[in-house]
């Protein structure tokens, strides 16, 4: 296929551009960026990485462009019940004295911080009134300093001149660390990831997309959350085919339990801020001592260098920071920020993380140890290099035939899932 993203993605993961996948389906998600091209290439990347792990090649990989675009959104069609809303009542974009800012308040402790900084009650109108009294950069700094999540809307040229924007532009798409050798491991048995133990310390949305992909092909994924964390609006998306448990890593016994899980795992994927595990006493060197052959892949929001390396962030905030939402507003003539039609940074980064995990596992089979780091902001940098015109002809929207006919009995009620966008030699996720 001809895809603007393939050479960059494949070179970042495999060290060189490799033959591409096959594609079927058509259409696109209307945007000022090539979002559907990115969705197709991201799913294809993970598929090719899995085919290589199974000693196959890209010629075995078939991606459905339409379905890949739909898998960049919510994939479940509730039958007779209604899923929770995606956003907290306070979360969203607000006008400030000199532009716009986005507050991310889905987590109760992040909402509490925003309200404390603003000195107002949990009422959207009151929050909007309070935000209007602030300059954007000052409110962003105050919320972040207090432990919350917010992002001032910038334009691409603002981000290019910002210290963090410059740092991101200088980073590779994937930070690889070739850190040792080991005894070669056995080849997998057949087209499956059965028996692969994946320890998942990630939250909405990129990391869970990566581990959902692995779980779909049979990996044993154990997701660990702190007791205070809750994702009711996306649980049916991010816990598919996984086991879930809770640990409070501030408690010594729970931390020791996590260490034991690390010793037993094949893969550890985590999305905490860059310094979080170091502060818990389980930094990179400690993890390698616990399990020398552990495949360790990390994800964060704002990259691995620069002044924002430890900043909290989510897809919607990165879109505001780097200029995606601002440029969308400018080009569309909208009176408010216009982000991507889907959280493409999260989903694209998720499939990139999955591909990195599989490539590191392929290296381990040959006796080489590799770890990787990925960020939403660097994924955004790639996407922003691939602009397009807004076009609603051929726009992709969910229709009943996009969903599996088989009922999926979830913990919330019966539902239908969007069909798989990927086949590898005829094998699809289950």
Language-model region placement:
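Acyl-CoA thioester-binding alpha/beta core of soluble enzymes
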Residues: 1-228, 255, 259-264, 287-303, ...
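Short, well-ordered alpha-helix to beta-strand connector turns
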Residues: 218, 241-242, 265, 314
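Glycine-rich phosphate-binding loop and adjoining beta1-alpha1-beta2 segment
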Residues: 219, 223-249, 257
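Rossmann-fold NAD(P)-binding glycine/threonine-rich loop
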Residues: 279-326
């Amino acid at each position: 296929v001809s895809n603007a993203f393939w050479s960059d993605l494949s070179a970042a993961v495999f060290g060189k551009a490799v033959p591409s996948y096959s594609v079927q389906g058509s259409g696109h998600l209307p945007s000022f960026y090539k979002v559907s091209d990115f969705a197709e290439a991201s799913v294809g990347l993970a598929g090719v990485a899995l085919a290589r792990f199974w000693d196959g090649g890209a010629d075995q990989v078939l991606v459905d462009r339409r379905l890949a675009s739909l898998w960049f959104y919510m994939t479940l069609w509730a039958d007779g019940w209604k899923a929770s809303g995606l956003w907290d009542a306070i979360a969203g974009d607000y006008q400030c004295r000199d532009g716009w800012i986005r507050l991310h308040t889905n987590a109760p402790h992040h909402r509490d911080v925003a309200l404390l900084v603003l000195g107002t009650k949990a009422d959207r109108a009151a929050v909007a009134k309070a935000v209007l009294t602030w300059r954007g950069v000052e409110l962003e700094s105050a919320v972040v300093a207090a432990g919350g999540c917010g992002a001032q809307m910038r334009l691409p040229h603002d981000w290019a001149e910002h210290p963090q924007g410059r740092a991101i532009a200088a980073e590779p798409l994937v930070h690889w660390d070739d850190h040792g050798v080991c005894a070669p491991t056995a080849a997998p048995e057949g087209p499956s990831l059965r028996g692969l133990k994946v320890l998942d310390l990630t939250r909405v949305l990129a990391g869970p997309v990566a581990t959902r992909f692995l779980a779909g092909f049979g990996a044993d994924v154990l997701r660990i959350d702190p007791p205070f964390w809750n994702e009711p609006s996306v649980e049916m998306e991010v816990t598919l085919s996984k086991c879930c448990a809770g640990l409070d890593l501030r408690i010594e016994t729970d931390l020791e339990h996590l260490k034991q899980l690390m010793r037993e795992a094949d893969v550890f994927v985590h999305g905490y801020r860059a310094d979080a595990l170091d502060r818990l006493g389980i930094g990179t060197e400690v993890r390698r001592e616990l399990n020398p052959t552990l495949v360790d892949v990390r994800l964060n929001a704002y990259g691995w260098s620069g002044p924002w390396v430890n900043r909290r962030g989510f897809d919607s905030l990165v879109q505001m920071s780097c200029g995606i939402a601002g440029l969308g507003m400018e080009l569309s003539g909208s009176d408010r920020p216009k982000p991507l039609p889907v959280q493409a940074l999260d989903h694209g980064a998720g499939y990139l993380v999955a591909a990195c995990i599989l490539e590191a596992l392929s290296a381990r089979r040959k006796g080489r140890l590799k770890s990787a780091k990925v960020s939403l902001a660097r994924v955004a940098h790639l996407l922003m290099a691939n602009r397009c015109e807004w076009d609603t002809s051929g726009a992709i929207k969910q229709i009943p035939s996009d969903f599996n006919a088989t009922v999926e009995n979830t913990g919330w009620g019966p539902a239908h899932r969007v069909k798989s966008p990927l086949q590898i030699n005829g094998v699809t996720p289950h």
